[in-house]
Amino acid sequence: MVGEGGTSAVYRADHPQHGVVALKVLREKLRQDRTAVARFTREAKFGTRVEHPNVVRTIETGESGPGGLHYLAIEWAAGEILERYAKRNAPLPREEVARIVIQIGDAVQAAHSAGIVHRDLKPDNVMYDPESHQVKLLDFGIAAATDTAPDERLTRAGFFVGTLMYVAPEALSGELVTPAADQYSLATIAYFLLTGSLPYLAKTPREMFTQLLSQPPIPLNRARPNLVFGPQVEAVIMRGLAKQPSDRYPDVISFANELRKALLATSVEDTGFLAKMKGLFGKK
């Protein structure tokens, strides 16, 4: 076993046609849970609809005999969960954040083009290989079609406890979640990668819930006292974190492109400044 969560365990396995795969198995205690099974099969359904180099490919799904275990075989992705990598290394270099965000944005845009909102974007649902700098988006288990009616959405008690810090405010107020919600989540991921902290610092889920609905996020330049970002970088991040979906960028790839441009422009400026300082002090 290479990983486990509340609903499933993940194993490294050999597939007869596809070689090494990640085999995700629904926990036995949940095989009679209709919501858990529906969510598990939904991951396979939506995963097969999004074909993109930055989305983990779904290879096979099924059940091991009548009444058996539900399983999902997906592409084996190199690297590690972005959450773990970022917790060890954040704040990450701006060029690295630009590479990560543009790949996630491109993958999510592909999902949106296929009529799917991911709804659970967070570093824990992203694989990242620091050697190749490749990103792979995971877990469409709570994704929804953009035309899904509110009474058809799958919910579960406690869902927001685990992912509340990355969820868009409109998702908390019962609105039908649109692609703009994924943009908000990606902006939160970018904020975390750049600073090592989050735009809201609540001590409890209840407090976080209240802050998300009623308070503005902490400005990027106030996240860490030793970090300073150019005004354009902060402006892009804060627009992505706007409370109202209509105040964000038109689509997620526009946000990702603007942030990449701002981060790389800042990096060039920083490099020039450092070069001048080294020359001033006679360093090579």
Regions found by a protein language model. Name each.
Residues 1-5, 10:
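Protein kinase glycine-rich loop
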Residues 60-62:
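A short, aromatic-enriched beta-strand patch in the conserved N-lobe beta-sheet
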Residues 130-169, 173:
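Activation segment of protein kinases
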Residues 165-268:
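C-terminal lobe helix-coil module of Hanks-type protein kinase domains
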Residues 27-49:
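AlphaC helix of the eukaryotic protein kinase fold
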Residues 66-81:
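Conserved short submotifs of the Hanks-type protein kinase catalytic core
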Residues 100-101:
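Activation segment signature within eukaryotic-like protein kinase domains
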Residues 105-116:
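Protein kinase catalytic-loop region centered on the HRD/HxD motif
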